Amino acid sequence: MSRVLVIESSARQEGSVSRQLTAEFLARWKAAHPNDEIVVRDLANEPVPHLDIDLLGGWTKPAEQQSEAEKAALARSERLTGELLGADVLVLAAPMYNFAIPSTLKAWLDHVLRAGVTFKYTENGPQGLLSGKRAFVLTARGGIYAGSPLDHQEPYLRQALGFIGIHDVSFIHAEGLNMGGDFQQKGLARAKEKLAQVA
């Protein structure tokens, strides 16, 4: 049995294409892996604070020197990191906001990309500590950006995940969703075809 960690980052609950892709992915995954445990963290319902001085203090100060706010910030980071460490499969669902990922997802990444926990520095440079995990990234985009200089989602997420040792990453993009005509239908159909191949 494997554990699947799903991170939802769309601000929308209704009408969200990235959430629609997540539902499609999970339906297929559960059918193929009925005994797997699914853990869902919804960053719209439970926002993760952006990196702040309390979290930095929690990471760097000895426990006896931490304020209550720093202890609370560290406990939150430990909880989020623990979910990632305990997962075999990571699913990131992210609409494209202004060419990149939602700030809520960036905040989550800031909590879990941690020196000494998910990566370490060595004399040969940084080394990811989460090798062996698999990741799927489900994106929803109003235009068509894959492979273009305007796509700051896929390059950043590949870099961030690779930095912590997750190199087996599949991207499923639903593109052209706001372009009118049959672009939305075709974009969704292509994304679902890709999901059927990888999930």
Curated annotation (Swiss-Prot):
Its domain of life reads Bacteria
User: Which InterPro entries does the UniProt entry name for this protein?
Assistant: Flavodoxin_fold, Flavoprotein-like_sf, FMN-dep_NADH:Q_OxRdtase_AzoR1, NADH:quinone_OxRdtase_FMN_depd
The entry marks the following residues as binding FMN, namely 10, 16-18, 96-99
Q: In the Enzyme Commission scheme, what number(s) does this protein have?
A: 1.6.5.-, 1.7.1.17
* Any Pfam family hit: Flavodoxin_2
Keyword Flavoprotein among record annotations = yes
| GO MF terms, alphabetically ordered | electron transfer activity; FMN binding; oxidoreductase activity, acting on NAD(P)H as acceptor; oxidoreductase activity, acting on NAD(P)H, quinone or similar compound as acceptor
SUPFAM superfamilies attached to this UniProt entry: Flavoproteins
The note on the cofactor says: Binds 1 FMN per subunit.
Q: Which UniProt keywords apply?
A: Flavoprotein, FMN, NAD, Oxidoreductase
Does the entry feature the keyword NAD, yes or no? Answer: yes
Entry cofactors: FMN
Q: Which reaction does it catalyse?
A: 2 a quinone + NADH + H(+) = 2 a 1,4-benzosemiquinone + NAD(+); N,N-dimethyl-1,4-phenylenediamine + anthranilate + 2 NAD(+) = 2-(4-dimethylaminophenyl)diazenylbenzoate + 2 NADH + 2 H(+)
Summary of subunit composition and partner proteins: Homodimer.
Instruction: Give the family this protein belongs to, as stated in its UniProt record.
Output: Belongs to the azoreductase type 1 family.
Sum up the protein's function in the record's words.
Quinone reductase that provides resistance to thiol-specific stress caused by electrophilic quinones.
Q: What is this protein called?
A: FMN-dependent NADH:quinone oxidoreductase
Q: Which organism is it from?
A: Azotobacter vinelandii (strain DJ / ATCC BAA-1303)
Q: What is the lineage of its organism?
A: Bacteria, Pseudomonadati, Pseudomonadota, Gammaproteobacteria, Pseudomonadales
